């Protein structure tokens, strides 16, 4: 895992703008969508979830991918690797109908056919909580050999927005 922070310095601003990129094990790896994302909120399309960027405070920043149904994706690490953590950040702001998922589930496979369940992380945020909230859903596991990571989130209501699936 490597994290790089880059800044563009503008003489007219008092503080530099910066971008934080997380180079985790799934960074820039192929993602297969078993259920498509919303055409209204595609973000960076097939690379949104593995581009290393976390979203900002708004789901319209081009880093948050929206779903109006359950989410079901498979990340191909392109080689068998040892992993111990899969996490993803979701947003909730109920005014425009954006909710946390009910839960996330993670499965792993070395061949893309036979999957092993690695766990479920249930949502702990009330669907009536009206303030803008973010939650990292996490599945920690004993070190596991995997090439394919299946990530599923269960829609609670309205939209669900996710910015990155981090694999370590």
Residues covered by each model-derived region:
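Short, surface-exposed acidic/glycine-rich loop or hinge patches that mediate macromolecular interfaces
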Residues: 80-82, 156
